[in-house]
């Protein structure tokens, strides 16, 4: 740790405290994540270390770079590139108004980061505005990729904040244990709607039951035909048969017709029907978009 000088505490992440720090040799500003482990007596599980070391190979401009892994006497500190703010803070500063072109740019960058990681069989599993970081150049980067697999997703953060269910798909809420890339695509859909509404969450549920009700009230309760595997999921229980909202115009009024179509393809209750990141990048919504 002598290599890095702590400058200030940035906040509490899902896995522990995050500090802004400076590399004493290069003077580069970095973010240090001290990972607190539940079973501190055991030290760092070797499986977690293996997973984390794989993440150092994820090099893409829309992924927060993991520079270094510092492992000493039962402590694990991850050294990441530093970004100025997360999407949640960005929303707070934009006063309920977000330019449609910025929405499109952020969504494109989010999908680019997802496509890259998914092509390497790395899932995020806990995407939310707090782990989408934005630097001074308006570049969006996905943080905490792969950490869920290495450490599991705790029920509570270390700041005692409950880990949010707002971005979880119905299959996961019904107890699905076999995750695929579709879990991240649902989260991307929720974030897309939140971008379009300048920071208003789409499904701000209070618990699993409320979360599923909010989803089904908007999208319609899936039938056995629409989602055959649903009733076999471990925590499945029947819900009232809500009809689907005919149009998303009132839900995301500032999103154009092609944007609403992309959103509908991301928010499919049946994970098999959800669009993948590569397909989403080819969607007509991005036809007139010129990546920087």
Swiss-Prot record:
Keyword Transcription regulation: no
Family matches, as Gene3D superfamilies: Phosphorylase Kinase, domain 1, Transferase(Phosphotransferase) domain 1
EC number annotated for this UniProt entry: 2.7.11.1
Record membrane topology: Peripheral membrane protein
Main location: nucleus
Catalysed reactions listed for this entry: L-seryl-[protein] + ATP = O-phospho-L-seryl-[protein] + ADP + H(+); L-threonyl-[protein] + ATP = O-phospho-L-threonyl-[protein] + ADP + H(+)
Subcellular location: Nucleus; Cytoplasm; Cell membrane; Perikaryon
Residues carrying N6-acetyllysine: 56
Entry superkingdom: Eukaryota
Cited PANTHER family: CELL DIVISION PROTEIN KINASE, CYCLIN-DEPENDENT KINASE 5
Descriptive protein name: Cyclin-dependent-like kinase 5
Source organism (scientific name): Xenopus laevis
Gene name, Swiss-Prot/TrEMBL: cdk5
């Amino acid at each position: 740790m002598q290599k890095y000088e702590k400058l200030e505490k940035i906040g509490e992440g899902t896995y522990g405290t995050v500090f802004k720090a400076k590399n004493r040799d290069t003077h580069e500003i970095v973010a240090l994540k001290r990972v607190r482990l539940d079973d501190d007596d055991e030290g760092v599980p070797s499986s977690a270390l293996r997973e984390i070391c794989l993440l150092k190979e994820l090099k893409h401009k829309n992924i927060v770079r993991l520079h270094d892994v510092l492992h000493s006497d039962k402590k694990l500190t991850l050294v990441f590139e530093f970004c100025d703010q997360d999407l949640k803070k960005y929303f707070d500063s934009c006063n309920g108004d977000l330019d449609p072109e910025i929405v499109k740019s952020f969504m494109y960058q989010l999908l680019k980061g997802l496509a890259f990681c998914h092509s390497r069989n790395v899932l995020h599993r806990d995407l939310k505005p707090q782990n989408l970081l934005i630097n001074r150049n308006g570049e969006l980067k996905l943080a905490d990729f792969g950490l869920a697999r290495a450490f599991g997703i705790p029920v509570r953060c270390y700041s005692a904040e409950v880990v949010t269910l707002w971005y979880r798909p119905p299959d996961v809420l019904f107890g699905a244990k076999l995750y695929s890339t579709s879990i991240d695509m649902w989260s991307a859909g929720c974030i897309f709607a939140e971008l379009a509404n300048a920071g208003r969450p789409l499904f701000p549920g209070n618990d699993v039951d409320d979360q599923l009700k909010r989803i089904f009230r908007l999208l319609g309760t899936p039938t056995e035909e629409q989602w055959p595997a649903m009733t076999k999921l471990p925590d499945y229980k029947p819900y009232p048969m809500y009809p689907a909202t005919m149009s998303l115009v009132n839900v995301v009024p500032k999103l154009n017709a092609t944007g609403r179509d992309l959103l509908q393809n991301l928010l499919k209750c049946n994970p098999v029907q959800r669009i993948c990141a590569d397909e989403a990048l080819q969607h007509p919504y991005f036809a007139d978009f010129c990546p920087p």
